[in-house]
Regions:
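A short alpha-helical cap/connector motif
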Residues: 1-116, 120-267
């Protein structure tokens, strides 16, 4: 029996997504695919260290040309995700287990230059992944979050519920409720620089200005979970969400010179 989620990953990684095939997509995500944008960040920024949670096929991991650490509970590599890298550390673990068992500095002594967080699609998991990754950040670290800008409410539930979808195009998509990271970071970490790029299929969030010494989210963790656990995008209202968190045109910041102005860099 085919796995609907595997079909989704295959669709995304082949980059066959046409923003015009669904009104819900074309209206809100007309930019560069998240896949191509991540590749461009690697090529332009040339990070010296890379960290990824939620690797699965290894398609985005393959972009890294530097020392890399990758975490996924079940790797499903397609092709060679290592390439010419001399150091790649693979951990087939849940991200919580990775952070409880390992010190990321052991593998990335100078911290994380660039990170892509695309793990479990429940907001508390992404929140913990963000908290734990920020501990290894420096002033110029760039952290990207996937699936935080769903095109409709059907794909934004905690449960997949494929059988109750009405949008033909997004019927097998699942972003989960990680969209909640946007109001959480806005309310609890206004010091961060957060941009939402209109990258199909479900947006790409770029976070900069990180502070490895911040304990704000850790101290507020229980409060955050209690506040957001039972909120759905239906009762939050997707129109309100889109008003509060408008997207940035990813095409404006795709060319190397413009992308350099968008991202911070180590000198």
């Amino acid at each position: 029996m085919d796995n609907p989620q595997s079909k989704l990953w295959s669709l995304q990684y082949q980059i066959k997504i046409n923003p015009n095939v669904s009104p819900s997509i074309s209206k809100f995500h007309q930019g560069i695919s998240y896949y191509d944008y991540l590749k461009q960040i690697h090529q332009v920024r040339k990070p010296s260290s890379y960290f990824e949670i939620g690797v699965e096929t290894g398609a985005t991991l393959a972009f890294a040309q530097c020392r890399a650490v990758a975490v996924d509970p079940k790797f499903q590599f397609q092709g060679n995700p290592i390439g010419r890298r001399t150091e790649t550390y693979l951990f087939q673990l849940k991200s919580d287990d990775f952070f409880s068992q390992h010190d990321l500095k052991k593998f990335l002594p100078d911290g994380v230059d660039f990170a892509f967080l695309d793990g479990m699609h429940h907001f508390e998991y992404l929140l913990r992944d963000f908290i734990n990754t920020e501990k290894y950040s420096h002033k110029d670290t760039v952290v990207t979050l996937h699936d935080c800008y769903p095109v409709n409410t059907e794909i934004a539930n905690r449960d997949m519920n494929y059988d109750h979808r009405t949008d033909v195009v997004t019927r097998i998509w699942w972003a989960g409720d990680v969209w909640k990271l946007l109001p959480i970071l806005r309310d609890f970490r206004p010091d961060l620089d957060v941009a939402v790029l209109d990258c199909p299929p479900t947006g790409l969030v770029v976070v900069q200005g990180l502070d490895p010494n911040s304990d704000t989210l850790i101290k507020a963790y229980d409060e955050i979970i209690a506040k957001y656990r039972d909120i759905t995008l239906e009762n939050y209202k997707i129109e309100q969400f889109r008003t509060e968190f408008s997207t940035t045109d990813s095409r404006r910041f795709f060319q190397p010179d413009l992308l350099k102005n968008f991202l911070t860099f180590r000198i």
